[in-house]
From Swiss-Prot:
One of its GO terms (molecular function) is cyclin-dependent protein serine/threonine kinase activity. Belongs to the protein kinase superfamily. CMGC Ser/Thr protein kinase family. CDC2/CDKX subfamily. GO terms for cellular component: cytoplasm; nucleus. ATP binds at residues 10-18, 33. Its EC number is 2.7.11.22. The active site is at 125 (proton acceptor). One of its GO terms (biological process) is intracellular signal transduction. It comes from Dictyostelium discoideum (Social amoeba). This is Probable serine/threonine-protein kinase DDB_G0268078. Residues 323-364, 381-404, 428-507 are annotated as: Disordered. Residues 323-347, 381-399, 451-470 have a biased composition (Low complexity).
Length: 507
């Protein structure tokens, strides 16, 4: 760690502390996370989920990992330094945030979650303290509790800060998955409008009561699994009927109707009914002008959604919903997407949202060669409903296994294309025209030679002798018939063959 000079400690947690430092050579300010656990070798270090997640998740809305250092059994993560987080920006604020600012923040959080979930990870500890701000750009940090979507449950029941914890986690469910991040986004969005936590419970039971007070208690019709979880732990939901008028309209008077609808969708009890990040991004709440500085290159959304379509992680039986309409109301949508709308007309599966024209980022994971199979994507028709997740089996891409097929290099892809196309090209080639054989003149018959009378008689005698059977040929091969049959004679082996083999064996 001689490369860095420590400045001050800026944070402390259960798993490690964060130190502000400076690179001695370059003068760059960095944030170093020092793990409290001791590690003897690299084999033990690479098993950390945080390392697995940060190595794979490279995105403009995710904090950048610069390097990992193991020194004297201490493990250090070196990140880019981001001074402010969302909690510090709103805790001492007295004036409400503009709606455009809230929209831009939630939009970037959903972009990051969409990238994380489609790459097989969910955060599990989403809260304002872990959302870093640098100008208009937002970045999610602290992946210490991140898990892979395809990892096998049970999971830890005590995760994330209690105020942003999903109901299924509060009920000690160990089979939760990525929708818990969606619940946290809904709680954060409501807090941005009110500048105070939406559900500030003092305990898990108090947290559930505060949720029921605002959202109403779940029923067997709205969340049958939640009723079963509550009964298994001896908990009974309070008898709070959902009000006819959404209470969020009263609690968040500065939020428009679209914002109230989106928060209500994000805070649904049943995790299977919560929208995916991609569906939330298509809500009409975002059908306004978004600053180009926070928009991502189309590939960030296009590639991930094409991956979902290709592997069937998006439910095809989703009906239309006005909240997720396909109207092209966003002025920032890329006009070039019209040229791609005809690519998948025959494909009845839903497609990703329309492209957004932004400068091409420098991230290496956007190289076209690695995603060459995802280039031509139609962006018109989108999976538009967030309510039709109620099925007996787990639907959506949350609880599906992600494709683990390794990406192929362009050279191997070209070789495979040649192996597929070459037989087709050969079949399409016309067969060679067969030329008729050239007619040859018939051979001229030569006249028979003139024989004398004596020669003719000799020739006739030779022909008569050839037609008569010979005595020697008739009885020539009958000597073996009188040979004695051996006692061990087998069917299919003649005695003559047996005598010859026995004589040879004696020799």
């Amino acid at each position: 760690m001689e490369k860095y000079q420590f400045i001050k400690q800026v944070g402390d947690g259960a798993y490690g502390d964060v130190i502000k430092a400076i690179d001695v050579k370059t003068g760059e300010i960095v944030a170093i996370k020092r793990m409290k656990k001791k590690f003897s070798d690299w084999k033990e270090c690479i098993q950390l989920r945080e390392i697995k997640a940060l190595k794979k998740l490279k995105h403009p809305n995710i904090v950048k990992l610069l390097e990992i250092i193991l020194e004297r059994d201490e493990l250090f993560f070196v990140f880019e330094y981001l001074e402010n987080n969302l909690y510090e920006s709103i805790k001492d604020r007295t004036k409400l945030l503009p709606e455009t600012t809230i929209r831009n923040i939630i939009y970037q959080i959903l972009q990051a979650l969409h990238f994380m979930h489609t790459n097989g990870f969910f955060h599990r500890d989403l809260k304002p303290e872990n959302i870093m701000l640098v100008g208009e750009r937002l970045k999610i940090a602290d992946f210490g509790l991140a898990r892979e979507i395809e990892s096998k449950p049970p999971f830890t029941d005590y995760i994330s800060t209690r105020w942003y914890r999903a109901p299924e986690v509060l009920l000690r469910c160990t089979y939760y998955n990525a929708p818990i991040d969606i619940w946290a986004v809904g709680a954060i969005m409501a807090e941005l409008y009110s500048l105070k936590p939406m559900f500030p419970g003092s305990s898990e039971i108090d947290q559930l009561f505060k949720i029921c007070t605002i959202m109403g208690s779940p029923t067997s019709a709205t969340w049958i699994d939640g009723i079963k979880l509550a009964n298994s732990m001896g908990f009974t939901f309070p008898n709070v009927q959902p009000p006819s008028i959404n209470p969020l309209s009263t609690l968040l008077p500065n939020a428009n109707q679209d914002a109230i609808e989106l928060i209500t969708d994000l805070l649904q009890y049943d995790p299977l009914k919560r929208p995916t990040p991609l569906q939330a991004l298509q809500h009409r709440y975002f059908k306004v002008s978004i600053p180009s500085s926070i928009l991502l290159k189309p590939n960030f959304i296009e590639l991930s959604n094409k991956y979902l379509i290709k592997n069937g992680y998006i439910n095809n039986n989703i009906n239309n919903n006005s909240n997720y309409s396909n109207n092209n109301n966003n002025n920032n949508l890329n006009s070039n997407s019209e040229n791609l709308n005809n690519v998948n007309k025959n494909n009845q599966q839903p497609h990703s949202p329309q492209k957004i024209q932004t400068p091409k980022p420098k991230n290496s994971f956007l190289r076209k060669s690695r995603y060459s199979y995802l280039n031509n994507v139609s962006l018109e028709n989108v999976n538009n409903n967030n309510n039709n997740y109620n099925s007996n089996t787990t639907s959506g891409y949350y609880n599906q296994k992600l494709d683990s097929t390794p990406r192929l290099s362009p050279r191997i892809v070209r070789q495979q294309q040649q192996q597929i196309l070459l037989p087709l090209i050969i079949q399409q080639q016309p067969p060679p025209q067969s030329q008729p054989p050239q007619s040859q003149p018939p051979p001229q018959s030569q006249p028979p030679p003139i024989l004398t009378q004596q020669q003719q008689q000799q020739q006739q005698q030779q022909q008569q002798q050839q037609q008569l059977p010979s005595k020697t040929t008739i009885y020539h091969n009958t000597n073996h018939l009188n040979a004695p049959i051996p006692p061990n004679h087998q069917r299919g082996i003649s005695p003559q063959f047996y005598n010859e083999t026995t004589n040879n064996s004696k020799l």
